Amino acid sequence: MIIHTKYHGQMNIKEEQIILFESGIPGFLEEKQFVILPLSEDSPFVALQSVTSENLAFIVVSPFIFFKNYEFDLDESTAELLDIDNIQDVEVMTILTMAEPFEKSTANLLAPIIVNRKNMMAKQVVLHDSSYTTKHPIGGESC
């Protein structure tokens, strides 16, 4: 399947690479299909690219790279919605807001993206009763 991307131009992807956000992503509820594309070979950062909207791509990363103590409890309804039966199948990502200099970039730890890699279903989850924010600086450990 050929898609047009924000950072890589035209690309050929396989159907099994598509991640389904059944309810969309907050602010982009009509966008349901995304694919993860590396930004470079040796970078932990990847693009979460919409399959249908060329200019819609989020820079995401595993939050554990920058925030070693990051933790939260996944609510049962999300685990059921994503059909999670093994924690080994789960990937957690956080959306970044990039800035210059890089150390001023921030991570949205309040609303992580949860992906079940077994069935490629995902959801952005808003953590309730959390001390995390949408703008944690990634320049230093702060959680």
UniProtKB/Swiss-Prot annotation:
One of its GO terms (biological process) is bacterial-type flagellum assembly. GO terms for cellular component: cytoplasm. Keywords: Bacterial flagellum biogenesis, Chaperone, Cytoplasm, Translation regulation. SUPFAM superfamilies: BH3618-like. Disulfide bonds: none annotated. InterPro entries: Flagellar_assembly_factor_FliW (IPR003775), Flagellar_assmbl_FliW_dom_sf (IPR024046). Disruption phenotype: Greatly reduced swarming motility, less flagellin. Fewer, shorter flagella assemble. Loss of motility and flagellar assembly are suppressed by deletion of csrA. Decreased expression of flagellin (Hag) which is suppressed by deletion of csrA. Interacts with flagellin in a 1:1 complex. Two molecules interact with each CsrA dimer; cannot interact with both flagellin and CsrA simultaneously. Has a higher affinity for CsrA than for flagellin. Interacts directly with flagellin (hag), forms a 3-way complex of Hag, FliS and FliW in which Flis and FliW do not directly interact. Interaction with Hag may occur via the C-terminus of Hag. Belongs to the FliW family. Acts as an anti-CsrA protein, binds CsrA and prevents it from repressing translation of its target genes, one of which is flagellin. Binds to flagellin (hag), which is implicated in polymerization, and participates in the assembly of the flagellum. An antagonist to translational regulator CsrA, it binds CsrA at an allosteric site and non-competitively inhibits CsrA binding to hag RNA. Partner switching by flagellin between FliW and CsrA provides a flagellar assembly checkpoint to tightly control the timing of flagellin synthesis. This is Flagellar assembly factor FliW. The lineage of its organism: Bacteria, Bacillati, Bacillota, Bacilli, Bacillales. The gene is fliW.
